[in-house]
Curated annotation (Swiss-Prot):
Major subcellular site: nucleus
Record's keyword terms, sorted: Nucleus, Phosphoprotein
Region (Disordered) location: 1-200
Compositional bias segments (type: Basic and acidic residues): 1-19, 47-85, 94-106, 114-153
Protein name: Transcription elongation factor A protein-like 3
Classification of source organism: Eukaryota, Metazoa, Chordata, Craniata, Vertebrata
Organism encoding this protein: Mus musculus (Mouse)
Free-text function comment from the UniProt entry: May be involved in transcriptional regulation.
Modified residues (Phosphoserine): S30
Length: 200
């Protein structure tokens, strides 16, 4: 609650109506500003005085407490808004004049992300270019990663040929022992048994 009060006080200072400090020139203005707020609040009742009176009379005659509850709710809502009249802005006061308190429907809050999108067409074009450039960079990085992975695979296949220069390693295709199954390079149709090899 303290944070809300701090925000309201900040708004009042911005509007030129601080609660504690009032300059002599501002006293007349603040009195004039408060008078329209007081006049604005009875306006919803002035719009429908007969309609509000009828449900109360019918509710008492017929004994329906639901309609009495609604009228009490209206009184509470308007009574609650009186202490905060200084904190209300002019637009809120106008909105209160247009519709009664029971028809209050909260508005949809605007998303913060939507506010920054309509800056200017130049900014949007720059954003598109930045996105395009970043996608190109991503493609380059992916290509570099695939190259590095391929080189790593080749080195792993080559195994222990550290004495051979790298240029020669790329040309060599590693071949494992031909006669043993389950080893790299071995296997396939050309595999022979130990008895088929002429010299052991």
């Amino acid at each position: 609650m303290e944070e809300v009060r701090g925000e309201n006080e900040g708004k009042l200072e911005k509007e030129g109506k601080p609660e504690d400090e009032v300059e002599p020139e501002d006293e007349e203005k603040s009195d004039e500003d408060e008078k329209p707020d007081k006049k604005a609040k009875p306006a919803p009742r002035q719009g429908k005085p007969e309609e509000e009176a009828k449900p109360d009379e019918q509710g008492q005659d017929e004994g329906k407490p639901e309609k009495q509850g609604k009228s009490d709710g209206e009184g509470k809502r308007q009574g609650e808004s009186k202490p905060d009249s200084q904190a209300k802005s002019a637009s809120e006061a106008r909105a209160a004049e247009k519709r009664p308190a029971e028809d209050y429907v909260p508005r949809k809050a605007k998303r913060k992300t939507d506010r920054g999108t309509d800056d200017s067409p130049k900014n949007s074009q720059e954003d598109l270019q930045d996105r395009h450039v970043s996608s190109e960079e991503m493609m380059r990085e992916c290509a570099d990663m695939t190259r590095a992975q391929e080189e790593l695979r080749k080195r792993q296949k080559m195994g222990g040929f550290h004495w051979v220069p790298r240029d020669a390693q790329d040309a060599l295709v590693p071949r494992g022992p031909r006669g043993v199954r389950g080893v790299r390079g071995g296997g396939g149709r050309s595999q022979r048994g130990l008895h088929d090899i002429p010299y052991l």
